[in-house]
């Protein structure tokens, strides 16, 4: 059955609502944790951040138990159980990937002492080793002069692509399959532009793991994010083929929601890169 038919039924409507609730709660908590880290300006793990991470784990586990009990009461078939498994496995996958990026950034900032660099009367925490790397042979000035516009373009590409993904589900609910394919195609196109710009950036700046420490950090984290963008594009291409078949049932709807959720996760990671790698460099150069 199509999603709009399922929602019109009370029982299945409650089931689908409960299926989406953990995704939304986890997404909102991820935004809260990200906002805290971006506001603090460093990856020093505080008690508040640890508590938020524990709350995420507790909520996912609690919702899994509640959903399992409700599924047994309603007597859902094997398809419903499969949807539930897909949903929670994907949640744990995204959460583990989020923690992987947190470890990368935390390793960068925890091994160095923080100093206060005055920038327009605002204290900007930058590591001692990091500031020395930035001033190394004027290399980073070259990077800033020729690559900053490309960074802004990449940010715009991912931001608009995320906005496009938000409209996919509503177009499917209205049976606007052609519109949903156009929206997903636009997101894929913007993602490919992002990949092209990243490859161009690495080529023109000759960034490798052996140039200097700054390039090692930039190359490692950017390459990891690059692979996540590539995986997201593959997922969206698969979704287009699923929409083309016009067999949009429970499982495929949940998969599309998971893909949208994953793409927003990629957006959040890019804003982390923009804040802690690129903008910190700009502040020191100023």
Curated annotation (Swiss-Prot):
It catalyses: 4 Fe(II)-[cytochrome c] + O2 + 8 H(+)(in) = 4 Fe(III)-[cytochrome c] + 2 H2O + 4 H(+)(out). GO terms for cellular component: mitochondrial inner membrane. GO terms for molecular function: cytochrome-c oxidase activity. The chain crosses the membrane at residues 13-33, 40-60, 85-105, 133-153, 173-195, 199-221, 223-243, 253-273. It is found in: Mitochondrion inner membrane. It is a multi-pass membrane protein. One of its GO terms (biological process) is aerobic electron transport chain. Its EC number is 7.1.1.9. The keyword Translocase applies. It is an enzyme of class 7 (translocase). InterPro entries: Cyt_c/ubiquinol_Oxase_su3 (IPR024791), Cyt_c_oxidase-like_su3 (IPR000298), Cyt_c_oxidase_su3-like_sf (IPR035973), Cyt_c_oxidase_su3_a-hlx (IPR013833). SUPFAM superfamilies: Cytochrome c oxidase subunit III-like. Pfam families: COX3. Disulfide bonds: none annotated. The keyword Signal does not apply. Keywords: Membrane, Mitochondrion, Mitochondrion inner membrane, Translocase, Transmembrane, Transmembrane helix. PROSITE patterns: COX3. Component of the cytochrome c oxidase (complex IV, CIV), a multisubunit enzyme composed of a catalytic core of 3 subunits and several supernumerary subunits. The complex exists as a monomer or a dimer and forms supercomplexes (SCs) in the inner mitochondrial membrane with ubiquinol-cytochrome c oxidoreductase (cytochrome b-c1 complex, complex III, CIII). Belongs to the cytochrome c oxidase subunit 3 family. PANTHER family: CYTOCHROME C OXIDASE SUBUNIT 3, CYTOCHROME C OXIDASE SUBUNIT III. Component of the cytochrome c oxidase, the last enzyme in the mitochondrial electron transport chain which drives oxidative phosphorylation. The respiratory chain contains 3 multisubunit complexes succinate dehydrogenase (complex II, CII), ubiquinol-cytochrome c oxidoreductase (cytochrome b-c1 complex, complex III, CIII) and cytochrome c oxidase (complex IV, CIV), that cooperate to transfer electrons derived from NADH and succinate to molecular oxygen, creating an electrochemical gradient over the inner membrane that drives transmembrane transport and the ATP synthase. This is Cytochrome c oxidase subunit 3. It comes from Trypanoplasma borreli. The gene is COIII.
